[in-house]
């Protein structure tokens, strides 16, 4: 049977469900697929099928994530749901599932709980652009309590820097929707309308400023130096001016040739593995870990704040805690750079399995911006992961 071609007639958006354990994230994910399946916009997925999510490895970390696809009249969605709380934290920090927006699920019977707060904070830290709230289990909650829960939620969202007064809060019962109850199904359709309208359409990678991390360097006698790598974003054309950023002082050059699979091209774009021939650049001046980018689009830095997750011993991480001044390697894009860690005030040590905010100072500058992900390594072994939350200098 011929494979169905992927139709690009609708914008593609990545979303996920977040929230406290047992508040109904997976039930909601199953309900969305079952309701949309009735109009042929999804394949219905069972709760149990989503709940026993396969394990994946991202930056050396094993994460269980369920991927579900569906569409509305306006968009095509890829939706992720994680069975365990630790999986959520790892997912958000490693960016394994980059979210353009998220549905925060809160049980109306409980209101915001510790993980609700933690997921909102993480969403803020790793720059999830927008949240929509699904207030679940409203069929078994006291209506007066629901009003209080909604107020409390709006305050909590505002406290963490989201527009709490404007965020859509949809009330419903995911379980009833899953069981085919018309009221339940109506709430799911309302939720999808809110997601369509409130979660902004992401800028496609090709529309962003050009950037390619350097993986390897060659010199072609009589022609110059070639940097190879996978183009992370944007488009590059022969004759474009670029900057070489990171590790050493920033230099400028011009792309005089683009090669892909031994063929010469006029342009390369996001996702392509390409070799860029650079005018007037010595082979020694280019090395793995640098990036070739649109001039002025990215700058090199050594000091930043980050949200990090430290692997548990069972996940192949450290067996012992670390302390202030810990000096591992930070793996950005294609290379390791040593850096020292400063712990927040009042934190004496970090145990395997912890997630927290830290300050880092690298021994060499790396091209970086907020939301850039990295792995924390010791001698090539991954012991943690992080996301840049703020550049200091």
UniProtKB/Swiss-Prot annotation:
<dbReference type="GO" id="GO:0003746">
    <property type="term" value="F:translation elongation factor activity"/>
</dbReference>
<dbReference type="InterPro" id="IPR033720">
    <property type="entry name" value="EFTU_2"/>
</dbReference>
<dbReference type="GO" id="GO:0005829">
    <property type="term" value="C:cytosol"/>
</dbReference>
<keyword id="KW-0378">Hydrolase</keyword>
<protein>
    <recommendedName>
        <fullName>Elongation factor Tu</fullName>
        <ecNumber>3.6.5.3</ecNumber>
    </recommendedName>
</protein>
<comment type="similarity">
    <text>Belongs to the TRAFAC class translation factor GTPase superfamily. Classic translation factor GTPase family. EF-Tu/EF-1A subfamily.</text>
</comment>
<dbReference type="InterPro" id="IPR031157">
    <property type="entry name" value="G_TR_CS"/>
</dbReference>
<feature type="region of interest" description="G1">
    <location>
        <begin position="19"/>
        <end position="26"/>
    </location>
</feature>
<dbReference type="InterPro" id="IPR004160">
    <property type="entry name" value="Transl_elong_EFTu/EF1A_C"/>
</dbReference>
<feature type="region of interest" description="G4">
    <location>
        <begin position="136"/>
        <end position="139"/>
    </location>
</feature>
<feature type="region of interest" description="G2">
    <location>
        <begin position="60"/>
        <end position="64"/>
    </location>
</feature>
<dbReference type="InterPro" id="IPR004161">
    <property type="entry name" value="EFTu-like_2"/>
</dbReference>
<keyword id="KW-0460">Magnesium</keyword>
<feature type="binding site">
    <location>
        <begin position="19"/>
        <end position="26"/>
    </location>
    <ligand>
        <name>GTP</name>
    </ligand>
</feature>
<keyword id="KW-0648">Protein biosynthesis</keyword>
<feature type="binding site">
    <location>
        <begin position="81"/>
        <end position="85"/>
    </location>
    <ligand>
        <name>GTP</name>
    </ligand>
</feature>
<comment type="subunit">
    <text>Monomer.</text>
</comment>
<dbReference type="InterPro" id="IPR000795">
    <property type="entry name" value="T_Tr_GTP-bd_dom"/>
</dbReference>
<keyword id="KW-0251">Elongation factor</keyword>
<feature type="region of interest" description="G3">
    <location>
        <begin position="81"/>
        <end position="84"/>
    </location>
</feature>
<dbReference type="InterPro" id="IPR041709">
    <property type="entry name" value="EF-Tu_GTP-bd"/>
</dbReference>
<dbReference type="InterPro" id="IPR009000">
    <property type="entry name" value="Transl_B-barrel_sf"/>
</dbReference>
<keyword id="KW-0547">Nucleotide-binding</keyword>
<feature type="domain" description="tr-type G">
    <location>
        <begin position="10"/>
        <end position="203"/>
    </location>
</feature>
<dbReference type="GO" id="GO:0005525">
    <property type="term" value="F:GTP binding"/>
</dbReference>
<dbReference type="InterPro" id="IPR009001">
    <property type="entry name" value="Transl_elong_EF1A/Init_IF2_C"/>
</dbReference>
<dbReference type="Pfam" id="PF03144">
    <property type="entry name" value="GTP_EFTU_D2"/>
</dbReference>
<keyword id="KW-0479">Metal-binding</keyword>
<dbReference type="InterPro" id="IPR004541">
    <property type="entry name" value="Transl_elong_EFTu/EF1A_bac/org"/>
</dbReference>
<dbReference type="InterPro" id="IPR050055">
    <property type="entry name" value="EF-Tu_GTPase"/>
</dbReference>
<dbReference type="Pfam" id="PF03143">
    <property type="entry name" value="GTP_EFTU_D3"/>
</dbReference>
<dbReference type="GO" id="GO:0003924">
    <property type="term" value="F:GTPase activity"/>
</dbReference>
<feature type="binding site">
    <location>
        <position position="26"/>
    </location>
    <ligand>
        <name>Mg(2+)</name>
    </ligand>
</feature>
<dbReference type="InterPro" id="IPR027417">
    <property type="entry name" value="P-loop_NTPase"/>
</dbReference>
<comment type="function">
    <text>GTP hydrolase that promotes the GTP-dependent binding of aminoacyl-tRNA to the A-site of ribosomes during protein biosynthesis.</text>
</comment>
<keyword id="KW-0963">Cytoplasm</keyword>
<keyword id="KW-0342">GTP-binding</keyword>
<dbReference type="InterPro" id="IPR005225">
    <property type="entry name" value="Small_GTP-bd"/>
</dbReference>
<feature type="region of interest" description="G5">
    <location>
        <begin position="173"/>
        <end position="175"/>
    </location>
</feature>
<feature type="binding site">
    <location>
        <begin position="136"/>
        <end position="139"/>
    </location>
    <ligand>
        <name>GTP</name>
    </ligand>
</feature>
<dbReference type="Pfam" id="PF00009">
    <property type="entry name" value="GTP_EFTU"/>
</dbReference>
